[in-house]
């Protein structure tokens, strides 16, 4: 169990999933901002290696392998990167986990190409989503595609790409910790200056 040393209450927990080819900005900005918001974040490798290489050649050490985790996270987060998403779409263990935790009303978040992973897991039917432009061009999946920065539909948060990662992370913070914590992080990162 993880406790917030600043307030004593139990910390929310988030798992961010990686494979080789992950989009560094989308992955590490989310990890950074959630940790600033006192959310416990584990970086999870979906490959058989605790080092994952980003789309732009940055190697990042993971906290755990997918086989080492349980289903007790409050949020499950999937950064983009076309190779990252392609690898995750082929990972049956991951797809089964996504379906299970989604049906338990856990928060599921994907940005850029990774909403296609959620599609492959079979959880997008009837949902409002967004993604990087064009990744769903040959897919008719029964979801409502919106060209917005971030789309929230129940326990599902999706976003479009690297420049919008700030807003994606803030929506996750708001969903887990509320509007006040989101405002605190917005002030800390000088969002009003953008």
Regions found by a protein language model. Name each.
Residues 50-52:
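Mobile, glycine-enriched helix-loop/loop "lid" segments at the mouths of ligand-binding/catalytic clefts
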Residues 28, 45-48:
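Short glycine/proline-centered loop/turn elements that form peptide/ligand docking sites
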Residues 13-16, 22, 35-45, 62-64, ...:
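Active-site-adjacent pocket-lining segments in enzyme domains
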Residues 54-62:
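A cross-family phosphate/adenosyl-ligand binding-site feature
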Residues 1-11:
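Short, Lys/Arg-enriched N-terminal segments with co-localized hydrophobic residues
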Residues 26-36:
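Short, solvent-exposed amphipathic alpha-helices that sit
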